[in-house]
Amino acid sequence: MKNNPLVTVGVALYNHEKYIVKCLESVVKQSYKNIELIVIDDGSPDNSYSVAKSYLDNQEDNKNYIIKTRPNKGMCNTLNEIAKLAKGKYISFVGSDDYWFIDKIEEQVRFLEEHNEYALVHSNSLKVDENNNETGVLDFSGKKNQGDIFESIIYGKGGINTPSHLYRTEVYNTIGYYDPSLKFEDTDFWLRLTKHFEVGYINKSHSY
């Protein structure tokens, strides 16, 4: 890859002290290295923040890692706070109880760098149980997954796999941020995005 643009990875952390290290480890160990990691703990009552901070503080190259905690404001407000701090050309959010394949960012950045017609790329996900045993695949290959998928989402014939997305940060200039008044913030955001932009798809699992 000729260019290595900065990628912002956001983690909205809440009550996942059991899973957060595995999540962060999958980001820190990405084969793609030009990453800005922003973790905001949304007032977790457990030890999520201290566990996450301890892990990141012990990383040798942590100058591009930001972690903070504050009183609970809800998922949407946390996602928006991260998005407004983002400096990357691309952005991806990983759930604090999810984790990624090591080549996720590298392959998706390459895809978007080669396909300027797409604002977002997504992939499949492997399903795992609490013991990390694989139980299936969240496979989008049989759905309308690429190009203009706005109407397909409305009619339930297509969609975006939220755990495996990467999109251009500049889309916020057109569609705005997540709507805190809604319960299903992802669906609303993807509808607004696909109303204005086309999306790409890689038929491969990149997340758990």
Label each region the model flagged:
Residues D103-G136:
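Conserved donor NDP-sugar-binding/catalytic core segment of glycosyltransferases
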Residues T69-A86, E107:
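Glycine-rich, basic loop-to-helix element that forms the pyrophosphate-binding segment
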Residues I35-G43, I66-R70, G95-S96:
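Short beta-strand/loop segment that forms part of the nucleotide-sugar
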Residues M1-K29:
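N-proximal low-complexity "stem/linker" segments adjacent to membrane-targeting elements
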Residues K84, S123, G142-Y208:
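Conserved nucleotide-sugar donor-binding catalytic segment
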Residues Y19-V21, D46-Y55, L79, Y99, ...:
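Acidic helix N-cap motif at the loop->helix transition within catalytic regions
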Residues I91:
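Short aromatic/hydrophobic "clamp" motif used to bind/position activated sugar donors
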Residues S26, D41-V51, G95:
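A conserved acidic beta->alpha catalytic loop
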